[in-house]
C-alpha cells in the first residue's frame, strides 16, 4: 500500500515554475548530465514541503544502455533527483552550514512503477527531521497520479574545505 501523500497533487500547478534550471543552479552544485531537476513548482518552508520535476528525455546519457529497446529511468537517478530537490530546499533557506547538502544515504526505498523517456517525474519532498549534522526527508515520486517511488533520504552538510 502506498504511503499517504505529502501534498494533494491537484494543488501542484506544474506550469507555475518557481525556479527553473538557472535558478536551481544558484543553490545546487550539480552540472551537465548530473543536473536531474528541471523546475521547482511548490515551496512551503513552514510545512517543510517542496515539489519539483524532471522531464525525462530521449537524449539522456543512460537511454541507450539502460534496458535497450525499452529504456527505463534508473532508480539511482530518481534517488539523485530527490537528493537534489532536498538540497535545494535546504540551500534556498540557508538551513545548513557548509557549501551544500550532500547525499548521506537512503532507507525504505520502494519503486512502484516504471519511468520512461517522455514522462514527467514529479517529486515531492517533506522535511521529517532537522539536525545540524543530518537532515531527513521523505520523498515521493509521481508520473501523472501514479506514485512510482518513495523513500527516506538523509542529507549531510558538505564543506569544500577539508576539516583538519
Model-derived features with residue positions:
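Hydrophobic beta-strand-centered segment that forms part of the acyl-chain substrate-binding groove
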Residues: 2, 9-18, 85-124, 148-150, ...
